[in-house]
Amino acid sequence: MVRKRIVAAGLVQCVGFRWVAGQNAARLGLTGWVCNREDGTVEMEVQGAAEAVDAFIGAAARGPRYAEVTHIEVEGRKPDPDERSFHVRGA
């Protein structure tokens, strides 16, 4: 199990990014969370199988249909063994 923090920049708010991230996490069997940040970026943490996390990161880099992702930042985090679901924060 791996956990990654992802920050997506560009036109990533008000385009369904958090909703799509939640759908992708559910489809891939990942736990974690996603939220909008005051600086206009979207921050996420996801954990699960390495291949599923990589697929999630790829989808985040592409963004949903109306997003324009200009930069993505990824860093490792310590897995949370007690986390059981994925949450959209600030919805």
Predicted regions span which residues?
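Intrinsically disordered, low-complexity, mixed-charge
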Residues: 1-91
